[in-house]
Curated annotation (Swiss-Prot):
The gene is clpS. Binds to the N-terminal domain of the chaperone ClpA. Belongs to the ClpS family. This is ATP-dependent Clp protease adapter protein ClpS. It comes from Mycobacterium tuberculosis (strain ATCC 25177 / H37Ra). GO terms for biological process: protein catabolic process; proteolysis.
């Protein structure tokens, strides 16, 4: 939130003062981790059903999980990421959330 200072004299202009940045305003992300249990086709299916991703996008994320060990699958508020992690756990996937850097 910005604070506006009133002009000191007639004919002078006002100046905005920046408020300090609150680090809790940063976005959160949901990360899916590779696991030895779920089939790649199932992980792709879960991404499509839970997040509404197209098959090519869901496949790209699944391959990132498979090849790199993890992938960011969603971003947003802390509360919405908690919901996403919970849904992924219910689907049997390994997922965590963290504050985006």
């Amino acid at each position: 939130m910005a604070v506006v200072s009133a002009p000191a004299k007639p004919g002078t202009t006002w100046q905005r003062e920046s408020a300090p940045v609150d680090v809790t305003d940063r976005a959160w992300v949901t990360i899916v981790w590779d696991d030895p249990v779920n089939l790649m086709s199932y992980v792709t299916y879960v991404f499509q059903k839970l997040f509404g991703y197209s098959e090519p996008h869901a496949t790209k994320l699944m391959l990132q999980v498979h090849n790199e060990g993890k992938a960011v699958v969603s971003a947003g508020s802390r509360e919405s990421m908690e919901v996403d992690v919970s849904k992924l756990h219910a689907a049997g996937l390994w997922a965590t959330m963290q504050q985006d850097r």
